[in-house]
């Protein structure tokens, strides 16, 4: 079963003239586990290895290189690019976010992205 906080390779479809991430890349599952178990879709946040780029954005969360993550380099979660995909877009499981504080930061970044904090609206 797909679980929140697990990192998979995901196929993000290319969109011409877009700034969105595309191709096969790592992503963190952020949808809740009840939906993950029952729905045909899953919500993910793509990762980028360009950790120096726009670190100041409140929707960017640094993912440090830690044992168990399966990542080969530190990464940046791009919460502004959250996307719901068919589960068939999931590739191989890479690992998981092993630091609970990182998942807490990612949850806040997602709340900022959807406008849940008035200070960002």
Task: Annotate each predicted stretch with a short phrase.
Residues 17-24, 29-65:
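Compact nucleic-acid interaction/catalytic patches
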Residues 66-121:
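C-terminal terminal-subdomain/extension
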């Amino acid at each position: 079963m797909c679980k929140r906080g697990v990192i998979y390779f995901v196929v993000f479809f290319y969109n011409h003239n877009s700034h969105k991430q595309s191709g096969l890349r790592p992503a963190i599952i952020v949808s809740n586990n009840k939906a993950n178990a029952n729905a045909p879709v899953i919500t993910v946040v793509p990762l980028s290895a360009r950790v120096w780029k726009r670190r100041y954005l409140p929707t960017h969360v640094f993912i440090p290189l830690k044992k168990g993550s399966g990542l080969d380099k530190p990464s940046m979660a791009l919460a502004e690019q959250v996307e719901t995909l068919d589960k068939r877009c999931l590739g191989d499981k890479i690992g998981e976010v092993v630091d609970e504080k990182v998942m807490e930061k990612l949850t806040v970044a997602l709340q900022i992205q959807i406008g849940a904090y008035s200070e960002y609206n």
